[in-house]
Amino acid sequence: MEPSQRSGSFSSISRRRSRVDSRPTYFKVTSKDLGFVDQVSEEYEFYTYPKKASEVESVTETFQSNRSSLVPTYPVDENANKLPPKVSIAFILINSLMSDMSLAVALPTSASYTQSLGGTNAFSGLVIGIPTLISLIFLYPMLCFANPKSANGYTLYFRPMVVSSFAHIFGHLLYCMAYRANWIYLILIGRMLNGIGFTTFLYHKKYTTDKLLVGQNRRTFLATMNILAQTLGFMAGPFLGGILAKATIHSKNAVWNQYTVASWVMLFMWFFYMLTIIFFFKEVTADKSEKVSQQKENDDEDRPKLSWKHKFLLFFLAEVAFIAYFTVNGYQASISIYTGKLYNYDAFQSGNFIALSALIVAPFILASSFLSRWLEDRHIMLGGLFLGILAVAIHLVLDAVHKLPMQVYFFLYSLMIYGYSIGSAPLISLSSKQLHPRHHNTASIVVQVGVSLSNTFGSICGGAIYNITTVGFISLCLGLAAVVYMQLIFMWGSLKCKTH
């Protein structure tokens, strides 16, 4: 075909296209389409030309309802502010306070009591620290006893509370009878029985952060209240031991004397506490609907396993607990020895030293319990650990140059107690927000293991402070804290609050 012919054919095609494009387009309209057009027309007139005030209100309500349907909504946790019965919270916190009183009541007189029976300062530190090691050994049997299968995932907190009361009653009894028997190891056996009672340290932390009892928004607050109860216990215990020792210093009675009187008082307090919880403690258990949901949760095979990241998190939390309580218990065990050599303090004065410090720190811990409303757990940990490290570092410098006035030492000791108390408060709360609920019990146990080991080894090192040397002991505390602080900074991003 020639080019002219090809161009002619193209021109004819373009003319036909132009005629087609210029023709009007017709659509087949059905009755359904007409109904849609009428509906759109009515809605346009309704929204655009209202005639009455009632019509205006109707238009506004319709617009707001349509608008709200376009706004994305997110599920709200209705149980975020849930709390268990207040009377039960009170009993748990009282148990925490009394447990710490039983642990610390021997601090002012432990060294002199063991020396009167032929012991040493290191043995005195063992007497103070051995109970928490025993509590670690009895932790698993207590878990089995408090978490039967019939509880459907709930923990029966009443059981460990009663067991702890019995253990403390008999532990204090044997501790008191050691002087009459003139057998130093009866002191140790009595403190070991106290250790069975100290298994409740786990349940204090667990109750205040239990996902089945406490809402997410309340966990850090209750955990800090538990720390406050512990602080008050460490205040009341040494004060009680010191003041009663001074009141009975001239007693020649082999049963009721300066070494045993405080333990007798604690025995009577535990007996009264046990009778009270039997009648007034309110246990929270699963109802029928919760039993069904709990059974489904237990049968779920798709629950996430503990990842390596979460395993490292658990190790880190246990490390924080160990180092914080190692330093606190080491300092407390060394108070009567350290102040006795530097400032010639007796048992009464060293007990007042510890008690006054706790009394001053307690209001600040109470005020800090409200920080969880504005700060994340990691921020609270960062600030608390920093204060503790700062106090220990200054103490190391002043002790090395032998220029440590009593007032300065008191301030540094109080600052260290406050910092580490606040820094270790959110550990269980943080784990409950980071881990799947399946692993919450594991987190509580891991943290409690760190606390128990630190109480034992910290008390032994504190009792042997002059065998280690004061600079060596303080340097050990500072070095351990520096390591965990660097780990906290390294893990900062992964500790951001999250829920499951």
Curated annotation (Swiss-Prot):
Q: Where is the composition biased (Low complexity)?
A: 1-13
Task: Reply yes or no: does the keyword Transport apply.
Answer: yes
Report keywords, A-Z. Answer: Golgi apparatus, Membrane, Phosphoprotein, Transmembrane, Transmembrane helix, Transport
Give the modified residues of type Phosphoserine: 9
In residue numbers, the region (Disordered) covers 1-23
- GO CC field: cell division site; cell tip; Golgi apparatus; membrane
Please indicate which superkingdom the organism of origin belongs to.
Answer: Eukaryota
Q: Where is it chiefly localized?
A: Golgi
- What membrane topology is annotated for this entry? Multi-pass membrane protein
What stretches pass through the bilayer? 87-107, 126-146, 156-176, 183-203, 225-245, 261-281, 312-332, 351-371, 380-400, 408-428, 445-465, 471-491
Q: Which CDD domains match?
A: MFS_MFSD8
Where is the protein found, in the record's own terms? Answer: Golgi apparatus; Membrane
Q: Which GO terms describe its molecular function?
A: transmembrane transporter activity
Q: Which Pfam families does the record associate with it?
A: MFS_1
Does this UniProt record's set of keywords contain Phosphoprotein? yes
Tell me which family the UniProt entry assigns to this protein.
Belongs to the major facilitator superfamily.
Protein name according to UniProt: Uncharacterized MFS-type transporter C330.07c
Species of the source: Schizosaccharomyces pombe (strain 972 / ATCC 24843)
